[in-house]
């Protein structure tokens, strides 16, 4: 299995959620202490011609977070793929798709507010981190599903003599 990478990880975390008097009912009902033991893994298939500044190929990753011991029992599934194609004169077009979903495994139970999903800054430009998506009152609470489609075009001919400058349009 050439260019196929399996990355497992086990993590244990303790979390204490506290709220204020003006918190919403959804926040207040999730107040308390939580202990999670999780098994995370990713499976990556890399067909790029180079891991650093690729010009051709793609990299595809499936990821999952499975609760081993948890008071919330939520599972995260995700998939991302990014492709690269040289257009002309060392200009490289990249297109990437990023998706994730979190699902509560307990019947009629919401996903814990601290486990909700937010798009990473690298996937969503022009917005404050954590300030996009569903709101509960004045608070951004993240979502159970997320997806982004990103494109970028590298233009190395703008600074041909500078080795340490990257320029991309996205």
Descriptions of predicted regions:
Residues 8, 12-165, 169-170:
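C-terminal outer-membrane beta-barrel translocator/porin domains of Gram-negative envelope proteins
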